UniProtKB/Swiss-Prot annotation:
Subcellular location(s) of the protein: Cytoplasm
HAMAP family: SRP54
Organism per entry: Methanobrevibacter smithii (strain ATCC 35061 / DSM 861 / OCM 144 / PS)
Residues where GTP binds: 106-113, 186-190, 244-247
The organism's place on the tree of life at top rank: Archaea
Name of one Pfam family that matches: SRP54_N
Subunit structure, interactors included: Part of the signal recognition particle protein translocation system, which is composed of SRP and FtsY. Archaeal SRP consists of a 7S RNA molecule of 300 nucleotides and two protein subunits: SRP54 and SRP19.
Function in brief: Involved in targeting and insertion of nascent membrane proteins into the cytoplasmic membrane. Binds to the hydrophobic signal sequence of the ribosome-nascent chain (RNC) as it emerges from the ribosomes. The SRP-RNC complex is then targeted to the cytoplasmic membrane where it interacts with the SRP receptor FtsY.
GO biological process, one term: SRP-dependent cotranslational protein targeting to membrane
Protein name as annotated: Signal recognition particle 54 kDa protein
Gene that encodes the chain: srp54
Claim: Aminoacyl-tRNA synthetase is one of the keywords in the record: no
This protein's record includes keyword RNA-binding: yes
Length: 445
């Protein structure tokens, strides 16, 4: 996420941990490296210099609290000041009235419609049943795109591609979904100079009387995100911001810091192309991940939202007891996939996230996908009892999956190593870092 920003900041933190004496020279070197990393991520230079000044001043003048080493104190200062740079407090989403009406705003191409789909999925996971109203009469494919998104998730949609009156659509949508807990209104993509659209937006605001107006901003535009946020705030009451496309953007840090500077809270961030690559923004957790400190709480929440509890319990029981089969291993892969891209999940594990490169993570994901294809060519008996798989079966499975026989053997080797590792953990009754490293190491080979 955010290009190489996380990787560069983690390297700086590691260097700081390895330094024996924390003096003025050390602090200045660390601050310079932080400056370099942030400027490369398109963070405004004035903001970077202000952050640097605060870190330097606190690091040189503050006495570490009792029981905290000078090194730990400097790391804490860097963490706290970077959290402040991104707005400090996590805004959260409180659905406290019925109907809770959300008005979506944004420029064309910002990812607004896709983000509506992601928010619907997020709300469904939290126990809400949202409905969507399409008032975008300017873009020909707007209704059709929303229809496809909402149909997949069984979210009710109101719209009429033949009706070119956005205000009429909004009124009818309100009537249609008056008993719904959450109603989301999609609007036409705007440009800050488009006076007709801005006027329409003001009238829509009067008709809908939204509980919250959310502005969607493309994270790849960097510092310009701040100007967008200001322009929209002047035209209407923007309650919060969603920043999209942060998974591969080298300018994402610039976008986030520029928006935070306007005072508009960042409520959600889009972290990938999948419908589940979307999370409530918490500056403290986010910076913790960027600095390589992990984010266990978000990892737990992701697991709770994504994983079938009964399946997970059964798989873990089999793993620990030594009854681990290829069925269990396939379930394990499905659970891993459901939590999102591997690089993103690893970034939440303290000390592990930035040890594994993007390339290695991608290779691992590709290897898992390959293993799943191979397993789909196996019979139920073979999946439940892999000991049955001898040379003749290996040949048949390889032909069915369209792979080399060596790839089938590679899968069986990984399975046997995993079974052996998990059986050993079951006997010892604990799961340590070495066990995790051994399992990850098998994939990274």
């Amino acid at each position: 996420m955010l290009g190489n920003l996380g990787e560069n900041l983690t390297k700086t933190m590691k260097k700081l941990v390895g330094i024996s004496v924390i003096d003025k020279k050390t602090i200045e070197e660390v601050v310079k490296e932080i400056q370099r990393a942030l400027i490369q991520s398109d963070v405004n230079i004035a903001l970077v210099l202000d952050l640097s000044k605060k870190i330097k001043k606190r690091a040189l003048e503050e006495e570490p609290p009792k029981g905290i080493t000078p090194r730990e104190h400097v790391i804490t200062i860097i963490y706290e000041e970077m959290v402040n740079l991104l707005g400090g407090e996590a805004p959260g989403l409180d659905i406290d009235v019925k109907p809770y009406k959300i008005l979506f705003l944004g420029l064309q191409g910002s990812g607004k419609t896709t983000t509506i789909g992601k928010l619907c999925r997020y709300l469904q996971k939290k126990g809400f049943n949202p409905a969507v109203v399409c008032t975008d009469t300017w873009r020909p494919a707007a209704y059709e795109q929303l229809r496809q998104l909402t149909e997949e998730m069984q979210v009710p949609l109101y719209g009429d591609p033949d009706n070119k009156d956005a205000l009429d659509l909004a009124q009818k949508g309100l009537k249609e979904f008056k008993n719904r807990k959450v109603i989301i209104f999609d609007t036409a993509g705007r440009h800050k100079q488009e006076e007709d659209l801005i006027a329409e937006m003001d009238t829509l605001d009067d008709i809908i009387q939204p509980t919250e107006s959310i502005l969607v901003i493309d994270g790849t535009i960097g510092q310009q995100a701040g100007e967008q946020a200001k322009a929209f705030s002047q035209a209407t009451d923007v309650g919060s911001i969603i920043i999209t496309k942060l998974d591969g953007s080298a300018k994402g840090g610039g976008a986030m810091s520029a928006v935070a500077e306007t005072g508009a809270p960042i409520k959600f961030i889009g972290t990938g192309e999948r419908i589940d690559d979307f999370e409530l923004f918490d500056p403290a957790r986010f910076i913790s991940r960027l600095l390589g400190m992990g984010d266990i709480q978000t990892l737990i929440e992701k697991a709770e939202d994504s994983i079938d509890e009964d399946m997970a319990e059964k798989t873990m029981k089999n793993m620990m007891s030594g009854k681990f089969t290829l069925v269990d291993m396939k379930n394990q892969f499905e659970m891993m996939n459901s939590m999102g891209p591997m690089q993103q999940v690893l970034s939440m594990i303290p000390g592990l996230g930035n040890k594994v490169s993007k390339e290695a993570s991608k290779m691992t994901e590709d290897k898992i996908d390959g293993y799943k294809v191979i397993m789909s060519s196996m019979t139920k008996k073979e999946m439940e009892n892999p000991k049955l798989i001898k040379q003749s079966r290996i040949r048949r499975i390889a032909m069915g999956a369209g792979v080399e026989e060596s790839e089938v053997r590679d899968l069986l080797k990984y399975y046997n190593n995993t079974k052996k590792t998990m059986k050993g953990i079951g006997k010892r009754g604990r799961f340590g870092n070495n066990s995790m490293n051994r399992m990850m190491g098998q994939f990274m080979k």
